[in-house]
């Protein structure tokens, strides 16, 4: 899994011009799945995201997790995180997970994370418009492939 984690003051996702979900302070996640992903990747990502300390404490140090600040998560599926750009000028997305597998993993990821932190989600495969107010900005890329190699 590849997940872009953005610390936000607020974020929302709209479909057909109507807001589907919105959150206040927390994380906006862009979640990509590949066919090689497994429950290991899913569990690793959930644990890392729930415990990642990138919110400022009273001393202005990044020392608090999304749980600590009682934040929320907006999760958006994004197969384009697996774009291959080595050849030509049009990206290939063949490395992205097959839709039926990716959707199941994405939904399981959201359900698992929601047991720890409030999670709202976009619609898998939909054309969505995402608005956010970055906080920092702080943007982190989590790639579970590295953890899988070292497991």
Swiss-Prot record:
Renumbered to this chain, motif Gly-cisPro motif, important for rejection of L-amino acids spans: 136-137
Purpose: An aminoacyl-tRNA editing enzyme that deacylates mischarged D-aminoacyl-tRNAs. Also deacylates mischarged glycyl-tRNA(Ala), protecting cells against glycine mischarging by AlaRS. Acts via tRNA-based rather than protein-based catalysis; rejects L-amino acids rather than detecting D-amino acids in the active site. By recycling D-aminoacyl-tRNA to D-amino acids and free tRNA molecules, this enzyme counteracts the toxicity associated with the formation of D-aminoacyl-tRNA entities in vivo and helps enforce protein L-homochirality.
Name-wise, this protein is D-aminoacyl-tRNA deacylase
Keywords, alphabetical? Cytoplasm, Hydrolase, RNA-binding, tRNA-binding
Superkingdom, taxonomy of origin: Bacteria
- In short, the EC number is 3.1.1.96
Which family does this protein fall into?
Belongs to the DTD family.
GO process terms (BP): D-amino acid catabolic process
Cellular component GO terms, alphabetical: cytoplasm
| Top EC category | hydrolase
- Where does the UniProt annotation locate this protein? Cytoplasm
- Description of its domains: A Gly-cisPro motif from one monomer fits into the active site of the other monomer to allow specific chiral rejection of L-amino acids.
UniProt cross-references to InterPro entries, sorted A to Z: Daa-tRNA_deacyls_DTD (IPR003732), DTD-like_sf (IPR023509)
What is said about its interaction partners and assembly? Homodimer.
Known HAMAP family for this protein? Deacylase_Dtd
């Amino acid at each position: 899994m590849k997940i872009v984690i953005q610390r936000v003051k607020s974020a929302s996702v709209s479909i057909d011009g109507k807001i589907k979900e919105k959150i206040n302070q927390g994380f906006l996640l862009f979640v990509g799945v590949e066919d090689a992903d497994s429950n290991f990747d899913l569990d690793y990502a959930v644990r890392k995201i729930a415990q990642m300390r990138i919110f400022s404490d009273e001393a202005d140090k990044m020392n608090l997790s999304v749980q600590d600040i009682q934040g929320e998560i907006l999760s958006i599926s994004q197969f384009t995180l697996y774009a291959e750009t080595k050849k030509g000028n049009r990206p290939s997305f063949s490395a992205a997970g097959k839709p039926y597998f990716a959707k199941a993993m994405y939904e399981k990821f959201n359900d698992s994370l929601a047991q720890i932190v409030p999670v709202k989600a976009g619609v898998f495969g939909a054309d969505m418009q995402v608005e956010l107010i970055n906080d920092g900005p702080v943007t982190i890329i989590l790639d579970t492939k590295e953890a899988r190699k070292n497991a």
